[in-house]
Amino acid sequence: MYPATPALIARWSAPQYRSVVSTVIFIGQEAGLVAGTLLAGVLCEYGFAGGWPSVFYVFGVVGCVWSAAWYLLCSDSPATHPRITATERKYWETTIGTTDLVAHPPTPWRKILTSVPVLALTVAYFACSWGYLTLVICLPLYMHDILGVDIAKNGVFSALPFVLPIVIGPVSGLLADWLRSKLSTTVVRKLFCAVSFTLVACILILTGYVGCNRVLAVAVMCAITACCSVSFSTVLVNQLDLAPLHAGKIMGLTSTIADLGAVAAPHVVSAMTQHRSTRSEWQNVFFLLAAMYAISAVVYVVFGSGERQSWADDNNASRD
């Protein structure tokens, strides 16, 4: 889904609204995390088929229903949509230049893979994914082992940090689009990444010292995810800035590398928390995440860009 999303946004959203459109779409992931975490905790405790197996059955059915709706309702572009009027189609083609975006020029893979702004975005996306997935996957363990929260309540406590991003993400998108009318896109993207990652790094350091106070620990986790969601206006949108025609491919590249961090994160956390109930071990986990966010913020601020790249519209680009 990740590579498909920016490709569709490039065809269905005017450039001046892409920050808010992207954040609103991707924030569905946060809503799913909240609902899924709450429901999974309840199903594990009270569900059918022995409890935890019911989680897979319920989520599997939901996935099938959504897939059917996507297949029936989604179209590549306004030019190919069977249910919009001619007036609407003309509006989109005039506003976005949809006719040009329907074309499939050769992909300049060499230029993409050696593009400094793309590499800087990849570093930022990797850090964001690593940190976020560490919270998603390992937060229930932290809640259980350090804070002593039982499995039924664990779902509630683990879901709370992902509520604020549902609001903060779209608001940051609106603010980013407004600021783009005042400042350059490059400045806006770097500003949101730097502010977000710096705040997250600082709060992660503080998290190591909050002790076993459940309310304070959950409040700090909520602050982390809220600040992290501000970066969505950079890491989930910048592909469209750099090369709208190739945004899906760049998203595929950056998200694949970022997902390597998601795969590695649980193993790294497991290696660092072998005793699990030791607060000092979890403190080291938070310090590692803080360092990753700080370093990636510097990399993106120095090397990132919000401008369309010279190779983005090269119809004669080589496929190598």
Residue ranges and their predicted role:
Residues R110-S172, S229-L236, L240, A265-P266:
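Extracytoplasmic gate region of multi-pass secondary transporters
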Residues M1-S13, S229-A243:
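Intracellular juxtamembrane helix-capping segments at the cytosolic ends
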Residues P82-I137, S181-L191, S196, D320:
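Flexible cytoplasmic loops linking transmembrane helices in multi-pass membrane transporters
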Residues T186-T234:
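C-terminal transmembrane helical hairpin of 12-TM major facilitator-type secondary transporters
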Residues Y17-F48, G60-G63, P161-G169, T254-H267:
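Glycine-rich segments within core transmembrane alpha-helices of 12-TM secondary carriers
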